[in-house]
Amino acid sequence: MKFLLLTVGLALIGAIQAVENIRSKNDLGVEKFVGSWYLREAAKTMEFSIPLFDMDIKEVNLTPEGNLELVLLEKADRCVEKKLLLKKTQKPTEFEIYISSESASYTFSVMETDYDSYFLFCLYNISDREKMACAHYVRRIEENKGMNEFKKILRTLAMPYTVIEVRTRDMCHV
């Protein structure tokens, strides 16, 4: 019994350290995000009216104010284009999204990217900084880079969460 308690205690300490080691990037070249991105995988702890978890990103545009504009493609009966504005904050890797249908604001935080192949982001509820969802986007449909980094980030989500694996045939192709 003592051995079991010791094992559980050590596992918890390891999990806490793993969570602390995953931070968002310190700097971000937002101009390098311009272009198309495809949703590879997403995980969320709740349902959102934010379409970001069901869509490919047709374009990422940089506004003159330094904000990001996402042009999204949602697949319903057909592919429909929608726009979402991410307002810059004091932190270079974080943007604010206000969703009027939810009367809520979220922080869009870029966790990891190599700019050429993949980027990982998480959404936080602004009021309590609780991580609500994370997603893995890639530049090319067949790309899988960033998968290990995404799995590490998933370990930081509150339980339970739902993982959505995207099939390329279900995507709106840009």
From Swiss-Prot:
- Record-level Gene Ontology MF annotations: retinol binding
Q: What cellular component GO annotations does this protein have? A: extracellular region
Keywords for this protein: Disulfide bond, Milk protein, Retinol-binding, Secreted, Signal, Transport
What protein family does this chain belong to? Belongs to the calycin superfamily. Lipocalin family.
Q: Which domain of life is it from?
A: Eukaryota
**Which cysteines share a disulfide bond?**
79-172, 122-134
The keyword Heme belongs to this UniProt entry's keyword annotation: no
Where in or outside the cell is it found?
Secreted
Instruction: Outline what the protein does.
Output: Lactoglobulin is the primary component of whey, it binds retinol and is probably involved in the transport of that molecule.
| Transport in keyword set | yes
Among SUPFAM superfamilies, the record links this protein to: Lipocalins
**Underlying gene:** LGB
Q: Where is the signal peptide?
A: 1-18
Q: What is this protein called?
A: Beta-lactoglobulin
- Organism, by scientific name, is Notamacropus eugenii (Tammar wallaby)
Q: What InterPro entries does the record point to?
A: Calycin, Lipocalin, Lipocln_cytosolic_FA-bd_dom
Quaternary organization:
Monomer.
